[in-house]
Amino acid sequence: MARPSLSRSNPLGFTPWPVTVITAVVYLALVVPLLVVHHVVPSAPSSSPKGLNLTEAWTDLQVLTNGFHPYNSHRNDEVHEWLLKRILELINSAPPASEYESVDEAKPDIVVFDDTQSNLTFSGRASGLGVYFESTNIMVYIRGWEEDKERWWEDPHGRPAGKGGVLVNAHYDSVSTGYGATDDGVGVVSCLQLIKYFTTPGHVPRRGLVLLFNNGEEDFLNGARVYSQHPISQLPHTFLNLEGAGAGGRATLFRSSDAEVTKPYMRAPHPFGSVLSANGFEAGLISSQTDYVVFEGDLGLRGLDVAFMEPRARYHTDEDDARHTSLDSVWHMLSAAVATTEGLVSDASGRFEGLPREDGRIASGSGPRGVWFDLFGSAFVVFELHTLFALSVTLLVVAPLVLLVTSIALNRADKMYLFRASASPEDSDGSEAVLLHGVRGFFRFPFLLVIPTAVTVGLAYLVTKFNPYIIHSSEYAVWSMMISAWVFLAWFVSRVADFARPSAFHRVYTLTWLFLVEWVLLVISTVYENKYGLAGGYFVFFAFAGTFLATWISYLELFALPRKSEYATQLALPSRRASSHGSRLGTASGEDVEDGEDEDEDDDGTTAEATETTSLLRGQRTTFANYVRVTGDYLRDDGDEPRQPNLYGHEQAWSIHLPKWVWVLQFLLTAPLVLTFVGPLALLLTSALRQTGQDGSSSLFIYIAVAALTTLLFIPLLPFIHRYTHHIPLFLLCVFAGTLIYNLVAFPFSPANRLKLFFIQEVDLDTGVNHASLSGAYPFVHDVASSLPSTAGQNITCDLDLLRPKCSWHGIPPQVVQPAEASKMKDWLSYNITRSDAEPKAQLSISGRNTRACKLVFDRPVLSFTVADSAYDPRFPHVSPDGTKEIRLWSREWGHTWTVDVEWAADTEETDEKGLRLSGRVVCLWSDGNTAGVIPALDEVRRYVPVWVGVSKLSDGLVEGSRRFEI
């Protein structure tokens, strides 16, 4: 039988150096661009595109963020007036009507609504919370050229005609401890630039466009909810929400309603995001919310949520400022907003129109759930979920059938060496057989997968126990530890297995196991797609498709082998038949001899050619004293055949017939697909979750996620890693040792990745006693509190049972109300109670000095409540099913008096007298920290905390003053 020839210097051969170099280069060639895309923001253009002015946008951001401007601050009023002024400047700077005629357009009508009339009472999604809120929203309506010219909103019963419009939303309030550059200053300046863009000739929208500058998002999405009470809210059917949950970087597509409304985002020059983030919101992995839930869930619109997502350590702190973001980040969000909005307002179809709804929500229709993801930040893929479901089901059925048919064809061709221990020669009576060792390597995969994965999971538990917050600042040290441990162990286990039982079928068996594992994962993913509408498992489909093709190629490779019977016939020569129970002098088998191995084997693992000095009995099995033991019918071993020059190591002799370059194709079908689809998800999850431990989230979860993602990313190496040289694995062993020590002992926070602690000062206005407190990761929060000058000699008490442990001390008294306004603390707020004599009802009037936010907190829930002059909307129930324990009151006026009527249940099991009683606290909030000395306890914290600590607000107010009442 002719033997195929193969040059030992084959650069694509399945030998150590080609395998090591090619796999390493492919991984680096994909990982490096993924890291660059994730961390480097595309540069803003040197000159502004037509209709935009990036210099104006950056200047606007600097003006907007020159102070804290929460809803309950005087700076917020200044921002409101500045926005109105800027909007009018942009409108007045629009070209004259003659310039529009040159592009066959008419100058659009623009209407500005300064909503200082709307209000709303509603209940929170959390049980027991009610909210009354007054609007200071600003809306800019750019009439579409396809729309009627009527001013329908001036009619109390008027409704828009024609197709629905588009809403773009950003909130102009910040938190009381952050300047709001990315949350949501970049969104605000993007909306300002959209006014400029869509009033430029050539860009006039087809559909009506509403730009909403809402106020009050940070305090419970209040601004978006009260927007529903303005007539213009009836116009939009689709929306784009611009938000910030980080402090720079790229703006990612967090979530979207469906595939149809997502497609306009494909126009973005640098799209970024994955549907997995939307599934994270649905699964509750991300606890914070945006106005998206109001527009989609409460109002019935269909839209997208685009937001900054990292770093969380700067989110809601004084580092959310213009200095810590960039013009490139502004451009990234602005360019996406322009492209998406232009796609929505130019849509001529009726796909965003639906039948009228009985629940009062917008009739925007419905679209199929979507699957979407970016490719290296340059392209964006969107398709419908049912398409993925159909493809998944098809692949689940077709792939096993293809392998089954191929196996049958191999068997009929007598070339099915897989799972075959031996073969009989042609015309044999069955008493003579040749060992094929075709089962070798089948049981390796479980060890290759389980041992490295188990160790990385163990590392996750180890780091969580000894240094749970290290990933907060050193995420790539954690990744390096996990990757180096996993790859080294996978290599070590595979090399041990290959040394003990060399097999040319390591690759095909490992691919077969991978096929089975990923088939099961695809079944699970497909079930979740169909049952729960979760599309985040789309990467499993692509990974399985690549693994299937690679596995199929391995099966097709077997057609290159000789027929088993033909091979056995050649090997089982009658002249070499041994006697039944005999011994003969022999030499040790090449599989059992290690001494002198280098003499017969080149560096690349191929065996040297036989010469006249080579032992004729090489390859025989020996027992003691070089005697071969043979029992029963003689079983010829393929190792008994003289050594072939192109045989790798001590693998089966028939393997020289297998193509030596096919592994490259198999690797390129598996690893790049996994890296392309899983790599961005790994980076996305790391960025989104690595700094959530300080918020009370589970630290173990993120480490387990890193361990699992490490397995997913490097599992394509398993069919090939036994061919690796020792250089990379030993280097990774050193990396593992260093990163393990670092991750266990290094301090987890730094000035660039600060620990966020949450401040509040609570004052009993009846007694004057106050307690300042910090909440956050323990024991760091206690150490920081103990380092403050005012806590020296105090007993700091810490409540460790809370989600965020809270440490309190007697604080420096606040000065949020000037002595001229109220000489005593109890005069900071006033209330009056009028109780019904016969029923468990009462009316409470509440007002506070130098504030426009107060609340009522009851010791037991009230059945119902109403706020004087408030609007009510059936889309927003205002009483929780289990009653209301807290009523938050917000006003656009300073020192406003709220009148609240409450009714509670009489306790029939106790005395009537006690049943008619209601007790609780009246609380007012102060949130303006712009002036030094107003909240000296906060000033002290900011001045004296370590550089690795950032300060955020714990609640709506920085200072909460309360007085008790009993009715």
From Swiss-Prot:
Disulfide topology: none
Cytoplasmic side, ranges: 1-16, 409-441, 494-507, 554-663, 722-727
Binding site for Zn(2+) 1: H171, D183, E243
Chief localization: membrane
Xref: InterPro entries: Fxna-like_M28_dom, M28_fam, Peptidase_M28, PFF1_C, PFF1_TM
Cell compartments where the protein resides: Vacuole membrane
Domain of life of the native organism: Eukaryota
Annotated segments matching region Disordered: 579-612
Active site: E217 (proton acceptor)
Site, as annotated: Transition state stabilizer: Y315
List of residues binding Zn(2+) 2: D183, E218, H316
Cofactor: Zn(2+)
One GO cellular component term: vacuolar membrane
EC numbers for this chain: 3.4.-.-
One Pfam family of this chain: PFF1_C
Residues carrying covalently attached carbohydrate according to the record: N53, N119, N795, N832
Signal sequence coordinates: none
Cofactor binding note from Swiss-Prot or TrEMBL: Binds 2 Zn(2+) ions per subunit.
Membrane-related topology note: Multi-pass membrane protein
GO biological process: proteolysis
Residue ranges with Acidic residues bias: 591-606
MF terms (GO), sorted A to Z: metal ion binding; metalloexopeptidase activity
Record's keyword terms, sorted: Glycoprotein, Hydrolase, Membrane, Metal-binding, Metalloprotease, Protease, Transmembrane, Transmembrane helix, Vacuole, Zinc
Vacuolar-facing ranges: 38-387, 463-472, 529-532, 685-700, 749-967
Family: Belongs to the peptidase M28 family.
Protein name as annotated: Vacuolar membrane protease
Annotated organism of origin: Neosartorya fischeri (strain ATCC 1020 / DSM 3700 / CBS 544.65 / FGSC A1164 / JCM 1740 / NRRL 181 / WB 181) (Aspergillus fischerianus)
